Amino acid sequence: MNLHEFQAKHLFTEAGIAIPRGYVARSSAEARAAAERLGGSAWVVKAQVHAGGRGKAGGVRVIQEGDEIERYADSLLGERLVTHQTDGRGQPIHALLVEEGLEIARELYLGALVDRASQRVVFMVSAAGGMDIEEVAASEPERIHTVRVHPAAGLQPYQCRQLGFALGLDKAQVGDLTRMMQGLYRLFLERDLSLVEINPLIVTGEGRLLALDAKVTVDDNAVEIGRQSQIQDMRDLTQEDETEVRAAEHNLNYITLDGNIGCMVNGAGLAMATMDVIKLHGGAPANFLDVGGGTNAERVAEAFKIILSSPSVEGILVNIFGGIVRCDMIAEGIVAAVQDVGVEVPVVVRLEGTNVEQGKQILADSGLDLIPADDLADAAAKIVDIAGQVA
């Protein structure tokens, strides 16, 4: 679960991390009032969307006149911002963050994430702040410095100093960085975060360290079990894929992709393998969809509806392994779902597991135009061929 910048900075404030003064605005009048409240001669106005690259896309601007703030706010609010991290439709803008203008001496990068390989929280810094850190890692990896935090010992002051010295900070700034990193680490643990980024972390003209930007991702599992109820209230569904939100309401794990072959599979591992085999046969999956272990007719019907909501889908591959549930029950669910939904694209079905022969017989006796497959390779070859003919 992602947070808006202003929400992330609210958490930063609770953790004692210094941020610029600023206010959230949801109208042009509120934006101007925020600037007047801040005072000064320059302000930074930022579109609040769940995407990076806002500056290059016109979603961040330094403004020096109140009238211009209103005009700029009017041009953003209610519109959609398209960046290199969004799809072609972009993300809707419902709020702006208006902050004080600051003199910037240096732009740095500070981030923390869960490294699955080492099973540690890893802190990263770079003197290449304000840039896409992935690009820096690819082109100049020597500019990124990291420390791994032992879960029993926690983040140690010497590790913070190590990164501060790597950035060339002076003694006072190293102390600021140490306090900032320790606050971030506490926040990371207390709020069940999986990622936090400050890009850029700036050194002001006065030599202070400030979090000029903020990106926070919360572990979805912690939110779903209710451990982070306060953060759950911060969720902005308008920033999420509508189909994925709908799928989650029915306990379906769905991710939109760019292909034309819809996939319905039980089990995340089998779903990924199914997509791999489709690609191997020259096709392109339109989605990842895990219907889960307790598959029933209602869930299968909803899965079909969600898959078919994409106009790009020209065929569907159903790949089910009957372990927890029997294949005959799954087949009955597929037949009922296809009859209920009125599926008009070709459907290839591969069943394997308990009572598989009974399941295949149910499909054969249904009178529906369901195409059986003997194994996954056969299923992938058939759906790729059929979808290609439809296209």
Curated annotation (Swiss-Prot):
Binds 1 Mg(2+) ion per subunit. It comes from the Bacteria. SUPFAM superfamilies: Glutathione synthetase ATP-binding domain-like (SSF56059), Succinyl-CoA synthetase domains (SSF52210). Mg(2+) binds at residues 199, 213. One of its GO terms (biological process) is succinyl-CoA metabolic process. GO terms for molecular function: ATP binding; magnesium ion binding; succinate-CoA ligase (ADP-forming) activity; succinate-CoA ligase (GDP-forming) activity. Its EC number is 6.2.1.5. GO terms for cellular component: cytosol; succinate-CoA ligase complex. It is an enzyme of class 6 (ligase). It catalyses: succinate + ATP + CoA = succinyl-CoA + ADP + phosphate; GTP + succinate + CoA = succinyl-CoA + GDP + phosphate. The keyword ATP-binding applies. The keyword Ribonucleoprotein does not apply. ATP binds at residues 46, 53-55, 99, 102, 107. Pfam families: ATP-grasp_2 (PF08442), Ligase_CoA (PF00549). Substrate binds at residues 266, 323-325. Residues 9-246 form the ATP-grasp domain. Pathway: Carbohydrate metabolism; tricarboxylic acid cycle; succinate from succinyl-CoA (ligase route): step 1/1. Succinyl-CoA synthetase functions in the citric acid cycle (TCA), coupling the hydrolysis of succinyl-CoA to the synthesis of either ATP or GTP and thus represents the only step of substrate-level phosphorylation in the TCA. The beta subunit provides nucleotide specificity of the enzyme and binds the substrate succinate, while the binding sites for coenzyme A and phosphate are found in the alpha subunit. Heterotetramer of two alpha and two beta subunits. Belongs to the succinate/malate CoA ligase beta subunit family. This is Succinate--CoA ligase [ADP-forming] subunit beta. The lineage of its organism: Bacteria, Pseudomonadati, Pseudomonadota, Gammaproteobacteria, Chromatiales.
